[in-house]
Amino acid sequence: MLPPQPSAAHQGRGGRSGLLPKGPAMLCRLCWLVSYSLAVLLLGCLLFLRKAAKPAGDPTAHQPFWAPPTPRHSRCPPNHTVSSASLSLPSRHRLFLTYRHCRNFSILLEPSGCSKDTFLLLAIKSQPGHVERRAAIRSTWGRVGGWARGRQLKLVFLLGVAGSAPPAQLLAYESREFDDILQWDFTEDFFNLTLKELHLQRWVVAACPQAHFMLKGDDDVFVHVPNVLEFLDGWDPAQDLLVGDVIRQALPNRNTKVKYFIPPSMYRATHYPPYAGGGGYVMSRATVRRLQAIMEDAELFPIDDVFVGMCLRRLGLSPMHHAGFKTFGIRRPLDPLDPCLYRGLLLVHRLSPLEMWTMWALVTDEGLKCAAGPIPQR
């Protein structure tokens, strides 16, 4: 995701104010959070200590536990002509251009597909080593049964391949235990997030075609699912929609020392098209299908959220801005850990697992008293 540009859309916005609960109740919650954090740190050990065998009726019971899928590296040959012409660029950019035409990678781990009643698919970008982040999401806002108001939600984590750590056996077991890991056979890298976007769109169209909406975000976002569902109540999934923290008039970064550097040879225009910050946004079923189709013919771009904005422009669509998406975090003078502020938002970016657990405990506390205040509007 690109650094925020100095614009009115990214200045601090108003929100609710409130007080943190104090006394024995707060102390009890903090003790629970500490205990839970320690438990999650032992997740890997617990997974290995649990019985590997599934019940006899489980269709995967015959699969050996200690046989994780082996990456089948792409046989796509490098484009040496492009590589020779880009010798003046940083190595990461040369590598991207050399293999930009390679866009078909195998699935290594795959969850079950969506049911016909799936209302919201939560597609979260993660990495193999982010075990604690995935555990935090599953135990907080990803506990979809407690948030869904009778509507069916599905959680999926999106991964590439990141060497041998953590052990592939652990990731394979995590996949079988939670049925929410979607991993492809390409290397985890910032420039490969566009590959992750393309392969996600393909998978959704194939495995979750009936999902009404999809929320795509990073594994360090806090999503207030009830607020997202309330917002979506007025939208038809058959109509185009992509809503989030929209960035307009962003300039390509020409500084070769930052990872967002884009040389003029890769993008000559003065500004990027409008795009939603990649920390998190929501799109309708109709937009998912149209994006997937246009992406198949689009030239890949190193920055994934800008790439989506480029595809939207080709479709003649504009992303919708909503102040409830805080993809650059909560700015001062607002309190970034005010639970009353979170109660009025849809998504907040850049929370650690401990902050996520803390905010979950506070936001879901029925005894929390908040002063009246406006809920962010579109």
UniProtKB/Swiss-Prot annotation:
Write down any Gene Ontology CC term. Answer: Golgi membrane
Q: In which pathway does it act?
A: Protein modification; protein glycosylation
**Known EC number:** 2.4.1.149
| Record's keyword annotation contains Glycosyltransferase | yes
- Gene3D superfamilies the record matches: 3.90.550.50
Where expressed (tissue)? Mainly expressed in brain tissues such as whole brain, hippocampus, amygdala, cerebellum and caudate nucleus. Also expressed in colon, esophagus and kidney.
- Subcellular location(s) per record: Golgi apparatus membrane
Output one GO BP term: keratan sulfate proteoglycan biosynthetic process
Q: Can you tell me where the transmembrane regions are? A: 29-49
Determine if Magnesium is one of this entry's keywords: no
Specify the domain of life of the species encoding this protein: Eukaryota
Region (Disordered) residue spans:
59-81
Arranged from A to Z, the UniProt key words for this protein are: Glycoprotein, Glycosyltransferase, Golgi apparatus, Membrane, Signal-anchor, Transferase, Transmembrane, Transmembrane helix
Question: Which GO terms label this protein's molecular function in UniProt?
Answer: N-acetyl-beta-D-glucosaminide beta-(1,3)-galactosyltransferase activity; N-acetyllactosaminide beta-1,3-N-acetylglucosaminyltransferase activity
Topological domain ranges for the Lumenal compartment: 50-378
PANTHER family, alphabetized? BETA-1,3-N-ACETYLGLUCOSAMINYLTRANSFERASE, N-ACETYLLACTOSAMINIDE BETA-1,3-N-ACETYLGLUCOSAMINYLTRANSFERASE 4
Function, as annotated, reads: Beta-1,3-N-acetylglucosaminyltransferase involved in the synthesis of poly-N-acetyllactosamine. Has activity for type 2 oligosaccharides.
This protein is called N-acetyllactosaminide beta-1,3-N-acetylglucosaminyltransferase 4
Which organism does this sequence originate in? Homo sapiens
